[in-house]
Design a protein with these regions (language model features):
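Helix-turn-helix DNA-binding segment
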Residues: 1-40, 45, 53, 60-61
Length: 64
């Protein structure tokens, strides 16, 4: 999982917990746009096509 930055891992953990971008932004004190960009980078780096796939990946990786 070293391919993801620490902040991307934080975002992925919250995505896997079912949090919305707005909720993640508030929790991590980021803009919604920044959360959106982190999620886009996560999808690209992990070669995934959806938020649901990212959430499943996070669960399998033990983030939740």
């Amino acid at each position: 999982m070293t391919v993801l930055t620490p902040r991307e891992r934080d975002v992925l953990k919250l995505v896997a917990q079912g949090q919305s971008n707005k909720d993640i932004a508030q929790r991590l004190v980021l803009s919604e746009h920044t959360v959106h960009r982190h999620l886009a980078n996560i999808l690209r780096k992990l070669d995934l096509s959806s938020r649901a796939a990212a959430a499943a990946w996070g669960v399998r990786a033990g983030l939740v």
